[in-house]
Amino acid sequence: ILDIVHERTIKTKKASIETRMAKTVEDRLNMYRMRYDIISDKIEKSIKKIPKINKIKWSPPRRNVKKGEEEVGLVLSDLHIGHSHSLEETGNISEYNTEVFVRRLHGLQKSVSDIYELHSNLYNLPTLHIFCLGDIVDGSNAAGAWSPVYIDTPVYDQLMLGFEHLSQCIEYLLTVFDNIKFYGVRGNHGRIAPSGVEKDYANWDNLIYNMLRVKFSENPRIQFNIPKTWWIMERIKNHNFLLVHGDDVKGSGNAIKNLEKFSTSMFGILKEKPDYTICGHFHESTELTSNFGKMIINGSFVGADVYAIKNLHKFSRPEQKIFGINNSHGVTWRYDLDLEYDK
């Protein structure tokens, strides 16, 4: 009997404790609810006391109202006229030949005029800067290890094709822009002899550039800058542009980081800081912004060729860069022109 009484006493105490615990939990929940209600009431009152802010609505600008002037930069590099590889050789991944080059150049022209039509609604765009960064030709078999089995056009014909089609391209762009400034930097594929046999500027690219200069010599709307150096530093709209082909950008690994190191070294040599360092050569369209400035690597007309796919295990689209240049902000809008897209 005593055990039964003891057990009942324990159960009664447990029940009492559980009741008190439940009440304590409920009291706490009620306390938190009241706190939340008080806070909510205060927030609601505060919101109602906030002064109303006039709504700002966007309204379209009046037609023909422009915001000043910008200039346009078009990067041309790595056309590799004379190079040839087929879809069969790349497993249906890529092809390139003279016909493809011409088609892509015409597509580029159309893209440039389309972009001009778009951005000229906002700014006056009187001047086009053509940054021609080399490897216009694919080169001669004896001048370098260019995989001669993938060159199907003699270098003389490469030269004439480059001159003919770049002339036509410039003539077309002169119908779009008031003025053109052409900058010619040679590439490594254009050298006329193996490295070290002739001076660096003895280069098929330079010959094409100078043929263009002679052709347009009586046209005051186009200017040419074709130095014997392998680089150009040009000040455009209060910003310095350092132009190189890219074969002198040394280092293993990341090309864009190596370009940054090159830009830093050139600053030490030239005692003038480049705001933008632009190169080609690597056949990959990429950019890097650092504390030092902006690095820009242009794409190529070729895209992924047999060497890139087989040896480097890389794929890249055929692209070229175009951008706006503002007096205050430097490079503003920019596009990678997809040359594979039929215009």
Over which residues does each language-model region extend?
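N-terminal short leaders/motifs
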Residues: 8-22, 176-194, 238, 242, ...
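Conserved beta-sheet core of the metallophosphoesterase superfamily
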Residues: 174, 191, 202-229, 237-242, ...
